[in-house]
Amino acid sequence: MEFSIKSGSPEKQRSACVVVGVFESRKMTLPAELLDKASGGYISDIVRRGDMEGKAGSTLLLHSVPSTLCDRILLVGLGKEKDFREKEFASAIRTAVKVLNETGAFDASIFLTELPVRKRSIAWRVRQTAMIALDATYKFDQFKSKKEEIRRPLRKLTISVERRNELAPAEEALAQGLAIAEGMAMAKTLGNLPPNICHPTYLAEQAQAMAEEFKLGCEILDRAEMEKLGMHSLLSVARGSHQPPKLIVLTYKGARASEKPIVLVGKGVTFDTGGISLKPGAEMDEMKYDMCGAASVLGTMQAVARMALPINLTVVVPATENMPGGNATRPGDIVTSMSGQTIEILNTDAEGRLILCDALTYAERFEPDTVIDVATLTGACVVALGSIATGLFANKDALARDLLDAGEDANDRGWHMPLWDDYQELLKSPFADMANIGGRWGGAISAACFLSRFTKKFDWAHLDIAGTAWKSGADKGATGRPVPMLAYYLLQRAGKLN
């Protein structure tokens, strides 16, 4: 889809469709009023009759409105004006784009971006509109032999700004929003791919292709190289699989060489059976999504490279399958991590932390400013937070606040979870430095505590996305989260968030 920014009055738009809003109860927004005036009260007559009440999520498509230059006008219900905030704005944009895609209009001009959202700039509104528009039209159907094609899909969206002095910040925000949306789409596609295709080698190939396209540094470590580094915790997870494990490293240099990099570490378990501690068969297919942490950091790297942010960024992805087999790790095995700390593996289905701990130790060599790991780590986090908020842990409160703020800005929220020393007691082992599980209670916290033992040399945050990385049910599929949160955080760090 093509996007453009324009400043102008709605009644003067030569477009296949113009989109304007109506609040409850039947209160037209200024762009709607301008169209109504041009049409001699045609729209207000329809609204008065009750065809459009302004309820949130409602729409009404009008054809050939008198004395207007557009073919169609789409009225979008916005709900109560006093309640119109970020969530309502996003919902209105998503509704509008989905309906537009089915109207037969090749191009449209959207005036919802002119609506004030408390404490949000025009740049925020445009950036969000671009992100939502691409996300709303995303489809994953490459394995369908018969695809459901939209006869005349929307091909061009013009985003309106009220004043000409808003054009420059809106153009910059549009480019940012499209880059973030494309990063989300990449993360979603990697997550949605079947595990017989998206295995560790495939992930490595995608990273290499991205490195070539965006002139990134790329290094792929194989099993032998990881053995030399002493990554026995990571490799213990790979022992049951015929698919070779990979450690994927991408580097982006947008700032001075002296500036310390931010490192993103993404869990890349491309299929998780649980290993010898086998999962139940029901819904095991969804364990292809256990690499969504890897997908999200790769998508974030793509977004940063597209935006050409003035930062240094490194992405590390430990990638493997977790399979049962004659050579698979057993409950009770003890391994030595790259850090030298020993781990008693009481449950082979708590494998994410076993690959992440070695990746976090590996990250030390970059002398990072900050390290953020992203992982579909624990079912306990889903129990605690459901599918709304990502679980956020950090060894520095300031870092946690920055990520929480980024999540609020991006409509990709997180919740700050405790990382108190009291919980470290849960990981005690009589035979090794630590166990890889901490018992039934506080599972998301004990998992984060485990990882914290490998992060003593840098500021670190952990995002548990087990509840937010994908959806089940009728809308089954990867969500692309937390690419928006991470991208907004990096935009803020780069001083490019308006």
Swiss-Prot record:
It catalyses: Release of an N-terminal amino acid, Xaa-|-Yaa-, in which Xaa is preferably Leu, but may be other amino acids including Pro although not Arg or Lys, and Yaa may be Pro. Amino acid amides and methyl esters are also readily hydrolyzed, but rates on arylamides are exceedingly low; Release of an N-terminal amino acid, preferentially leucine, but not glutamic or aspartic acids. It is found in: Cytoplasm. The keyword Membrane does not apply. Its EC number is 3.4.11.1, 3.4.11.10. The keyword Manganese applies. Mn(2+) 2 binds at K267, D272, D290, E351. Mn(2+) 1 binds at D272, D349, E351. One of its GO terms (molecular function) is metalloaminopeptidase activity. The active site is at K279, R353. This is Probable cytosol aminopeptidase. It comes from Dechloromonas aromatica (strain RCB).
